[in-house]
């Protein structure tokens, strides 16, 4: 009680060698004003990364204009080399061109060929003992400032990037329990820059063995039947086994401290509570989130000793305590009391999938995102279609916006054909088509440059899912993006005696009676025992397609299928229009709603752009927010982490 006062699975070697650079300080970025506080709106928030501004695409000019401070580094000088998208390279990737000492080294090399040895030595000494140089060591971005601080703290203790992501993701389940938690699941995307390797760790929930037939599921299905087998803690443990550095018990102990010592209620949590309907009416839920019958207010100080005890237990006894212990029995009993069918075998059978991401090349970069049952192939398809259009800064704004809308319609329609490939082999074939550049060329021909077309999938896509986002770029040269969820806010609303809030992920399956229009479900996403539902949890990582130097990005979004639309637009802003990350996250976004054939645009969308769209036949619907997208960017040795400026709670920290 709060005190308010193998198939797809692959076996990978545990552990990962980490070459740690020195971290001298962890400055806190200034807290941002809540949404709407600034007189000029969200565009004023672009100043958050003003120290880079356009320089995050031109680090050399930044170096020349700043007094630089050199920090010790354990990496050798850096260089570039050509590597295939998913091939490992043993050569030190940072041995030349990527070094921010590039200009100095050029001078040294020239001097070595021109002057005597003594002059050369003098020049080398000047570089090493003259004006110091600045390196950014990492970045952490999460939906809550408390969790961002925890992530940077883990890096300060020389934890790996994955360690920081684990602690931050578990923290998010404490501070924003409506969006994620131990009773949910998600997906993690990990990229090793040095080895040019990527892993998707899929810990999405699965349907229980006793799930009713599709025809027996109704709109008013009992909340217990909406609960899938949680995967959150096993997913974090698998990630730690592969890429962790600090002890598991230490990571969970640090997270438990957040619950035990307390935190302030976020605006997002308070908003979710204020919008609650009668679904969440159990006595235990009321005690936790609606004390005295009133929702918690922003800033209210809350402690969660119940979750602290659970995390300490999992840290000491491992994940077996969750999947074959007293916690298991609690979850089963609570689900049964709410009409569910979970049994012990569901927990003992649960496993995490480790696989490679799907990827494409776009504007000289590789883009990685999760494979099915996640909608990554649909995101890739959108980029492949857009790449064939003549999109430039000087081109027609109206054409670009129209192409974007029509492309997203196609991508979202394709996504309705995805599901768990382990239960339907056709999904693999479908996904391969979405990844094809030639197929994208054919789909591009379907777009009429002057007129909108109507497209409605036979079953609705997940559009309102709450989710937590964590992005980490650490000094070990790993990039990590995690998106976790309970599905709709507060999941099923079922809370165990230990304080675990359970998910409602069965809603992400397709079943005919889920909606009022009784749309026919697609077979690839039917609810069947042991299957994972289709997902729009889309952590996305970008790196240069050739060599090691250039722009690296990490992005994640929330709000179901709207995350796909928003991530695509941010990628185009950065990679096509060469905008800096701050501006790319701030710009207005759009999302086509296929069921209603309307086009949602957020409050930052310019009226001039709306006029362009209306002229092409689009029916525009203004909404406050389409999706929140956070980002982290690395350009050579410069790293910055930024939250979506629409969020009053999220925080990005750049580590020097």
Name each model-derived stretch.
Residues 369-372, 377, 527-530, 542-562, ...:
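Extended C-terminal regions of large enzymes
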Residues 285, 292-293, 340, 389-486, ...:
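Internal maturation/activation junctions in enzymes
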Residues 164-169, 249-260, 330-333, 396-415, ...:
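Short, well-structured alpha-helical segments that form the helix of a local strand-helix-strand
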Residues 354, 464-467, 535-537:
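Short, small/polar residue-rich loop motifs at catalytic or cofactor-binding pockets
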Residues 175-178, 187-191, 195, 199, ...:
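Active-site rim segments in enzyme catalytic domains, especially the processed small/beta chain
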Residues 180-192, 468-473, 539-541, 628-635, ...:
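Short beta-strand scaffold segments in enzyme catalytic cores
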Residues 10, 15-33, 39-153, 157-374, ...:
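Noncatalytic scaffold domains of N-terminal-nucleophile
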Residues 528-532, 567, 574-624:
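Extended C-terminal subregions enriched in glycine
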